[in-house]
């Protein structure tokens, strides 16, 4: 971490005198720059092109050095559009990698890949910046203890628990509740863990980024009246950006999260939406730099690029970064190199189901498809593991019986199967719960359910103690006591 001069500071003018180059070639977002002999910039150095285009418009383009070509030439990738640049324009070597603002002042704000605020709320009130390129923490700094990251969301904590400092893949199509789940996690980490979040929008739709910002303001995750009380910082590099920006925006978000972990010593949630677009941007840059493509046209450095990002997301003795990454699977092909490389790094998967969303069961997390490496008796304990397995078995049996029920009806089932179906339907409904961030839409107050309460509730359903209660009593409640109270209210209404 360091205090860096911004490019508008007088301190930069001395750099300008020292190391100036000139543009020799422009191919789309790729620039070749010639420097004086012996003054070649390092790989990953930031270069700044300032000047005016042919119609007198001000130009300020930042690039990142990717290759040293020989003959005093470097090849750099632009982080913004190169419209208006011409050969012969002056290029300033800043002498350092891209650096972005970090710390509490970033909360509630939206940044681009360069760490510049893009929300029209004025400059960021911090002089502390951090370079986006750094190595992963050393082994000696890592916290290797396996511990569960409690989210307060029943279906996640019971069936596919998150690891503190782990990486989770979030799979789901449009309109099944990905955004609401992300916002609830941001809200819960702030309330239960005193932590904050960083959201990296990598190569997704600008409209979705805008919608997310508006929803965060509406639900209180971003506090408009007192911006410092916000729980999240947003970093956007959307679909319309050049590939250089999309390739680096994930690192910008990660750098902000690392500062909160290492300096503020807090737990951080890092959301990356979408990790596939990070790979896709790397593939575009690789082709522009003239590298030979690898399998399915991807960059030959795919595993290295993915590893350099993912290995920085970890728990240290100071704090943890727990990352939730939306994963787009091209043509639903899980063997595609991009998702296949991502899977190697994931500790858990949360799969959202359109079928459950259609039934009105929110969060629409599929209890049978979602997985976690943490669901082992030696990590979560015998009681948790046994309860989770019995819940999955009951739901699996219900799934198998659905065809018979659809054709012949419930009456044709055996007594045992009818009991299984009744309990499975109660479990399915009890896996739903009201969210804090959805209060403004639903009118029902949100619920945070601790892990011990969650396990107790499902044990009571499985034991048959609650067989007499109507299944609608289990729908959209917090803990099991609320379900029994709701059942009594329903009984009272009938009378």
From Swiss-Prot:
Binding-site residues for ATP, renumbered to this chain: 172-179
GO CC list: chloroplast thylakoid membrane; mitochondrion; proton-transporting ATP synthase complex
Pfam families: ATP-synt_ab, ATP-synt_ab_N, ATP-synt_VA_C
PROSITE patterns (UniProt xref): ATPASE_ALPHA_BETA
Entries under CDD domains matching the protein: ATP-synt_F1_beta_C, ATP-synt_F1_beta_N, F1-ATPase_beta_CD
Recorded catalytic activity of this chain's protein: ATP + H2O + 4 H(+)(in) = ADP + phosphate + 5 H(+)(out)
Molecular-function annotations in GO: ATP binding; ATP hydrolysis activity; proton-transporting ATP synthase activity, rotational mechanism
Domain of life: Eukaryota
Subcellular location: Plastid, Chloroplast thylakoid membrane
Entry-linked SUPFAM superfamilies: C-terminal domain of alpha and beta subunits of F1 ATP synthase, N-terminal domain of alpha and beta subunits of F1 ATP synthase, P-loop containing nucleoside triphosphate hydrolases
Gene Ontology BP annotations: proton motive force-driven mitochondrial ATP synthesis
Main location, first listed in the record: plastid
EC assignment: 7.1.2.2
Keywords: ATP synthesis, ATP-binding, CF(1), Chloroplast, Hydrogen ion transport, Ion transport, Membrane, Nucleotide-binding, Plastid, Thylakoid, Translocase, Transport
Membrane topology, from the record: Peripheral membrane protein
Subunit and partners: F-type ATPases have 2 components, CF(1) - the catalytic core - and CF(0) - the membrane proton channel. CF(1) has five subunits: alpha(3), beta(3), gamma(1), delta(1), epsilon(1). CF(0) has four main subunits: a(1), b(1), b'(1) and c(9-12).
NCBIfam families: atpD
Family: Belongs to the ATPase alpha/beta chains family.
Cited function: Produces ATP from ADP in the presence of a proton gradient across the membrane. The catalytic sites are hosted primarily by the beta subunits.
Protein's name according to its UniProt entry: ATP synthase subunit beta, chloroplastic
Species this protein is from: Eucomis bicolor
Organism taxonomic ancestry: Eukaryota, Viridiplantae, Streptophyta, Embryophyta, Tracheophyta
Name of the gene: atpB
